[in-house]
Each structure stands twice: as structure tokens, then as C-alpha cells.
Swiss-Prot record:
Subunit structure: The cytochrome bc1 complex contains 11 subunits: 3 respiratory subunits (MT-CYB, CYC1 and UQCRFS1), 2 core proteins (UQCRC1 and UQCRC2) and 6 low-molecular weight proteins (UQCRH/QCR6, UQCRB/QCR7, UQCRQ/QCR8, UQCR10/QCR9, UQCR11/QCR10 and a cleavage product of UQCRFS1). This cytochrome bc1 complex then forms a dimer.
Membrane topology: Multi-pass membrane protein
PANTHER family assigned to the protein according to its UniProt record, in alphabetical order: CYTOCHROME B (PTHR19271:SF16)
TM regions (residue ranges): 33-53, 77-98, 113-133, 178-198, 226-246, 288-308, 320-340, 347-367
CDD domains: cytochrome_b_C, Cytochrome_b_N
Annotated gene: MT-CYB
Listed InterPro entries: Cyt_b/b6_C (IPR005798), Cyt_b/b6_C_sf (IPR036150), Cyt_b/b6_N (IPR005797), Cytb/b6-like_sf (IPR027387), Cytochrome_b (IPR030689), Cytochrome_b_C_euk/bac (IPR048260), Cytochrome_b_N_euk/bac (IPR048259), Di-haem_cyt_TM (IPR016174)
Name of this protein: Cytochrome b
A cellular component term, taken from the record's GO annotations: mitochondrial inner membrane
Localization, UniProt: Mitochondrion inner membrane
Length: 379
């Protein structure tokens, strides 16, 4: 009799994806972040669902409903802070996952990579709309500033912004539709994750050497399930430490002030995970140029497979490319810092230099150094 795990139409899919899946024997902890992202998504959907049971998407009551969740709902405070800080964990895992893909050449699997980029954009859109829902000062002004960027689009910009707002300013209609989309998008993300995994399992996983590992595979369970559980425990420890000891560490104090269209906060800035893109946006004096740079700062990932000039897939044995990769990492951290600073010298010039360096490193230096390494190795 065949094992039900291998014969049942539904269980068979789970078996081939998570149990009997052949995996390279040498993948490191950098390959943990995919499963951590899945867990983050599940956690966000569950906590979000319970929060939605008590939240009201009306400008008059939204702020008070969040206060009510924290004060009156049983364990509402932990749900709210798990959801808010869970988003931060989500983005930490997301950026590390993308960084891993860049370092080890995972972008060679172009379908998986491209679905991943679409996922990144969708998660960013979801997080942005979620930040608007508590209807604090930073929620309101963040929504106003970021949606207003679309007015830079020639001809249709102004109409497009008013269409998104549902009126002539960010108001009740905007909040209601943002709540609707914020609720809907995670389920669309879940479906896209399945497509992401479908394409990944067509080719199999990459590994740190960048060399095909078809002749040395091991079953995913128990080897990588136990490894993923360790990653999960570490992530949960960090998340719970954040939620229980310092839940507002990554938030903005201005968001504890109810939204007031008549009073602009001194420094409008998004959540920390968008600061690098915000710094790139601010570093260009022209509005349309800034918006284009903002979009391209993420969309540039789509052309990375075309810029791969090295004869080796991974950066493991390419010290010059490694130096550039860590320069890029330091550069992104610099941009994140600049995005949170006021628009004054020396922050303006540092932001402009870091933005130029970001695009130069990816578009010119990485392909150039890869070609140079090929010549040095006489390939």
C-alpha cells in the first residue's frame, strides 16, 4: 500500500514541497529567510484579521478604535504591537532575502526573481496602506505626501491623485479604500507566494557555491525543517523582545497625535523600512525625477540578471564583487539614516552622493568588476 503522503492528491503537493523535496546539502542559514517570510505573512494575516474585527475605517473613529483595541480588547495591545513590529520583521527578512539573492546569484532563475520583485512591490504597497489606518498625524501626512507624488505624472497626474483620494484631499473615502486594499492584498500576496514557490521548485534551489548540486541532494525534512525551526525561534525571540519591551522603538511618536489636516508635523517621514527609497526621492530637486528615481531604486532589481557579466554565478569566490556588495549594503544603511534626517546640510549632499553611488554601483561597477574578475582568472 502506497503511503497516503505520496498518493493523496492534496497531501502529495505538500509532501513534494516541504517533506520529500530534494534540497542541496550545503545551503546555509541565508536560505532560511524564505520560510521566515512565509511565517511573517501568516502572522500578519492572523493578527490583522483579529485587529480588523475591532477597527473602524472612518476618519471620525479610526484613531479611537485603535486606542480601544489597545485599552479595552483582551490582549488587543499585543495584537496591535505584534502586527506593527511584525511588519518590521517582515521587511528585515525581505531585505536579507533579496540581499542573499544578489550575493549568491539566485536572480539567474529569472521567473522566480521577477515574481519576487512583484511581491516586494505588493508588500511595500500593503505596508504603506497599513501605516495610514491608525489615522495619526504621520499616517495622514504620509498618505498625503506619498499619494501626491503621482501628480508628477504628466497629463493625468492630478486626476489620478484625486481618483485615488476619492475627493480633493486625503479623507474618509481614502481611509476606507486603503483599509479595503490593506485587507485584500495579503491574500493576493499569499497566492503570488505559491507561484513564486512553483517556479522555484521547477529549477530547485541555488546554493552558496553557485554550482549545480543535482548529484548531492538531501530531503528537505528533517534536515531543513529543523533548521527553519531554529530560524523561526530566533526571529520570534527578537520580535517578542521588541513587542514586550520596546513596542514603539521603530514607530513615530507623531502617530500618537490624531490626524489634523491643519497642522503639519515638523518632519514627515515614512516607516524605517522605506527611508532608503525616501532619501533617494528627496535627493533629486525635480519632482518627476525624484518619483522616477524612487520607482527605479526597486525596479532596478529587474535588470540585474541582464547585468550579470561574471562567468561564476555566486560571489563566494569573487572578492572584488564582495567588496562592492558590502559597499552597496553600507550605502543603503547610509540612505536609511539620511531618510530620517531633516532636509538641511550636510544631510542633503550626503543623500545625493549616496543616491548616485547606489545606482553607479549596480549599473556600472558590479558588471565592470565582474568582467575584470573574468580577465584576472583568464576566463
Amino acid at each position: 500500500m502506497t503511503n497516503i503522503r505520496k498518493s493523496h492528491p492534496l497531501i502529495k503537493i505538500i509532501n513534494n514541497s516541504f517533506i520529500d523535496l530534494p534540497a542541496p546539502s550545503n545551503i546555509s542559514s541565508w536560505w532560511n529567510f524564505g520560510s521566515l517570510l512565509g511565517i511573517c505573512l501568516g502572522l500578519q494575516i492572523i493578527t490583522g484579521l483579529f485587529l480588523a474585527m475591532h477597527y473602524t475605517s472612518d476618519t471620525a473613529t479610526a484613531f479611537n478604535s485603535v486606542t480601544h483595541i489597545c485599552r479595552d480588547v483582551n490582549y488587543g495591545w499585543i495584537l496591535r504591537y505584534l502586527h506593527a513590529n511584525g511588519a518590521s520583521m517582515f521587511f528585515i527578512c525581505l531585505y536579507l532575502h533579496v540581499g542573499r539573492g544578489l550575493y549568491y546569484g539566485s536572480y539567474i532563475y529569472s521567473e522566480t526573481w521577477n515574481i519576487g520583485i512583484i511581491l516586494l512591490f505588493t508588500v511595500m504597497a500593503t505596508a504603506f496602506m497599513g501605516y495610514v489606518l491608525p489615522w495619526g498625524q504621520m499616517s495622514f501626512w504620509g498618505a498625503t505626501v506619498i499619494t501626491n507624488l503621482l501628480s508628477a505624472i504628466p497629463y493625468i497626474g492630478t486626476e489620478l491623485v484625486q481618483w485615488i483620494w476619492g475627493g480633493f484631499s486625503v479623507d474618509k473615502a481614502t481611509l476606507t479604500r486603503f483599509f479595503a486594499f490593506h485587507f485584500l492584498l495579503p491574500f493576493i500576496i499569499s497566492a503570488m507566494v505559491m507561484v513564486h514557490l512553483l517556479f522555484l521548485h521547477e529549477t530547485g534551489s541555488n546554493n552558496p557555491t553557485g554550482i549545480p548540486s543535482n548529484m548531492d541532494m538531501i530531503p528537505f525534512h528533517p534536515y531543513y525543517t529543523i533548521k527553519d525551526i531554529l530560524g523561526l525561534l530566533i526571529m520570534l525571540t527578537v520580535l517578542l523582545a521588541l513587542v514586550l519591551f520596546s513596542p514603539d522603538l521603530l514607530g513615530d511618536p507623531d502617530n500618537y497625535i490624531p490626524a489634523n489636516p491643519l497642522n503639519t508635523p515638523p518632519h514627515i517621514k515614512p516607516e524605517w523600512y522605506f527611508l532608503f527609497a525616501y532619501a533617494i526621492l528627496r535627493s533629486i530637486p525635480n519632482k518627476l525625477g525624484g518619483v522616477l528615481a524612487l520607482v527605479l531604486s526597486i525596479l532596478i532589481l529587474a535588470i540585474i540578471p541582464l547585468l550579470h557579466t561574471s562567468k561564476q554565478r555566486s560571489m563566494t569566490f569573487r572578492p572584488m564583487s564582495q567588496c562592492l556588495f558590502w559597499l552597496l549594503t553600507a550605502n543603503l544603511l547610509t540612505l536609511t539614516w539620511i531618510g530620517g534626517q531633516p532636509v538641511e546640510q550636510p544631510y542633503i549632499i550626503i543623500g545625493q552622493l549616496a543616491s548616485i553611488l547606489y545606482f553607479t554601483t549596480i549599473l556600472i561597477l558590479l558588471p565592470l568588476f565582474s568582467t575584470l574578475e573574468n580577465h584576472l582568472l583568464k576566463w
